Amino acid sequence: MLPSYLADNDLSSIKLVATDMDLTLLADDKSMPEGVDDRIDALARHGIVFCAASGRPGLALRESFPDHHADMAIVADNGASVYLRDRLVYRDLIDRDLYHEVLALAVNTPGSVPVLCAFDDAYVLERDREHEGVLSIYYRSITYVESFDKLDVDSNKISIYFPGWDSKKNLDEVYAPAFDSRLYLTCAGNEWLDFMNIGIDKGSGIRHLVEHLGIDLANVAAFGDTYNDIPMLDIVGHSYVMANAAEHMHAHGKFLAPSNNEAGVLTVIDRIVEAAE
């Protein structure tokens, strides 16, 4: 069992607070916890940068923080794009032939709904429009196409949505055997599988961000609940696993934060702000 968040007594050195979104900052119903804007302001008053680190694209994350996106950092697309105060400071691109190969397999794999991520845009097959209710939560600008074959766009990530909530099974049995030597694959919960270039993950995104901020990884606090948070949790000085996370995640955190439905991230931020005063 991880020590409680109350055991972290070196909070005054923190300069960056990075949090995953789904099942970490957000409640189970996808709602933002009450008071998050006040906490971002409080961190800023003490020179501490707030960062949303997510598999979601930059546009969706900016819209999640309408009053603060110009004052915060965003690690989007699992580290494939990084923004600091609305400025793109890093981006990565997947080879076009390679993303077409992934899409071709996904199109022909039952239960797979592929999404080609192109920074603020996303491309989805017309046949999968029935899933728009879910997809639009994560992708604000969706273009539906009859086929991926003729697409020639810059892409930093491929995502696959699994309505059967069996992403790990599909990762192990279908996609990892085909691509894990050429791409980094990670599950984002039970319903999503993400593909980025090898070396691209939330951890690499945080590394790019701290380089631009001129701070050390030891001065970063990070919060997460699932597989795609592991690279970020493993490298920071203050890693918090949410109480609602699966037990295997405890190996990747130093402390246990209250659950997402208890606004656990905000509870720890309050302690960070108090230590900075």
Residue ranges of each PLM-predicted region?
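Short, structured coil segments at secondary-structure junctions
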Residues: 67-70, 78, 178-181, 235-236, ...
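Short hydrophobic/aromatic-enriched beta-strand-loop microsegments
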Residues: 71-77, 92, 135-136, 239-243, ...
